[in-house]
Amino acid sequence: MDLLKQRKMGILPEIDIAGHAYTVDLRLNELRNVELPNKKLSLDEMVTAPNGRHYLFFYDIESRSILHASSDMVTLPTNAVLVEIPDELGLDPVGMARKYGLSDEYFLKMHPYEKAGKATLTSLDKSGLPEFVVANQKLLQQDLQDPQKITFRKSP
């Protein structure tokens, strides 16, 4: 049975992220780990790439979770990569059509249904995260030199 027929019968597509298989579930707006279904990656937590056709996020390979870069990140994570995956139409055009009440074939001319894809991985040293961490370290050093800033930042 071909992939499109399987999808129309309700079999959800999968994508490989750093060697981990994820089920694409657009109805719930998430990628669900095939081996550990409680490990979910929410599409809402991902950033749209500049081209508007992909999502970007940092992925912790060990914990199988999205890694959030924040102002308190002062060390570079060791088991993480920058991940790029297609947007919803690239992941599951049939699922997108169903989400909006359209026929299953609605998006297939521009977005053919394909075999499960593989995420594009970029090492952290080429992701911009090291520079972000260095900037956070500098801010932390400035805060340590000015105790008022520490108190100000920590107050509710």
Regions found by a protein language model. Give the residues of each.
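Non-Sec secretion/translocation targeting segments of pathogen effectors
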Residues: 24, 133, 148-156
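A positional "C-terminalness" feature that preferentially activates on distal terminal regions of long
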Residues: 95, 103-128
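Short, flexible domain-boundary/linker segments around small modular repeats
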Residues: 1-17, 31, 37-67, 85
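OB-fold/S1-family single-stranded nucleic acid-binding modules
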Residues: 72-73
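Eukaryotic compositionally biased low-complexity/IDR segments
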Residues: 88, 116-132, 140-149
